[in-house]
């Protein structure tokens, strides 16, 4: 069985064609600058890259070129579209309605449109991608895999805000959490690495990248997570502010005369480690500047570390202990110095870092010592494979041939 995984951004599209026998991608690629001049498709097969430069006015045209690339005589990997058993779509927001992945039908599409108000930046391109695929592959089953679904197991006292209850009832204002597909994947992988049943474990998964979030996973279920109603809450991120006093928003608007759009831009695009350091949103640049004595770069790293430690401490308390802490995503998987900074302050949990093993980049490794009371793992996330697994499971459950 071959599953096509599609992840649509506002002007980009990532894809993988995964052979479910080996669970390996047989082709993958990225389309950039959709609807903008200079659009390009980079298609990868067997370690070789092929660039297709063609005007792509919309996502439909982009997906058309992706499908053409997959069957191309020179760099294609399948003979025809019938070889694709199903398409798995990453959808950022599934609201309260979807606690798991779902076969896409007209009712699901209506619900996705309804969730646009909850994810105005992310859900529209997801919907456009689904519609484009439906037009081009009308007989192929489509599955929606939601970033929010894994967090739907949060108890009410963890997802409710202390706001008037009718704001939740009428407008769905509550914590949803994001990066769920990644947290789900690495928590399952951690159980495998530890040789234990996930139902018997208390895990803290740290998805650290330009966007970052933590999740508390107790007995295989997410019981808390750091992002909230939107992906702006929680940790200090690349350009996002994370948790701040909400009254700062009204202060900026009333006292400093910022518009709502300006405040939104500041908090989403100009804050985080970029805003503090004044250098970059890339942790590699900030680490370099800090090593050269830049005080604001060092401050940005300390604020980031402090937030991660606060959440690890809180989630250890929430779960009544922790068996393992997992680092994943761009920074979590690849940054030895960031992991070291965080782990060095977790000695109170009986954690001991193996300095040599912590040098790992992009591979699965236990980076704590043998006698560390709490295990620490670095595990590369694989959201595409998780989407493909969910898609396969749903197609088989619905007996779709």
Curated annotation (Swiss-Prot):
Question: What's the superkingdom here?
Answer: Bacteria
Q: Which GO terms describe its cellular component?
A: cytoplasm
Any one Pfam family match given in the protein's UniProt record, by short name? Acetate_kinase
Binding of substrate, residues: 90
The entry marks the following residues as binding Mg(2+), namely 7, 383
What cofactor requirement does the entry state? Mg(2+); Mn(2+)
Which EC main class describes this enzyme? Answer: transferase
Sorted alphabetically, which keywords does the UniProt record give?
ATP-binding, Cytoplasm, Kinase, Magnesium, Metal-binding, Nucleotide-binding, Transferase
Site for Transition state stabilizer, residues: 179, 240
Record pathway: Metabolic intermediate biosynthesis; acetyl-CoA biosynthesis; acetyl-CoA from acetate: step 1/2
Cite a single GO MF annotation.
Answer: ATP binding
Tell me where it resides: Cytoplasm
The UniProt entry's GO biological process terms, in alphabetical order, are: acetate metabolic process; acetyl-CoA biosynthetic process
- Quote the catalytic residue positions: 147
Q: What is its main location?
A: cytoplasm
Q: How is the cofactor bound?
A: Mg(2+). Can also accept Mn(2+).
Which Gene3D superfamilies does the UniProt entry name for this protein? 3.30.420.40
Q: How does it assemble?
A: Homodimer.
This molecule's function is given as: Catalyzes the formation of acetyl phosphate from acetate and ATP. Can also catalyze the reverse reaction.
* Entry protein name: Acetate kinase
Organism annotation: Clostridium novyi (strain NT)
Which lineage ranks, top first, belong to the organism behind this chain? Bacteria, Bacillati, Bacillota, Clostridia, Eubacteriales
What's the name of its gene?
ackA
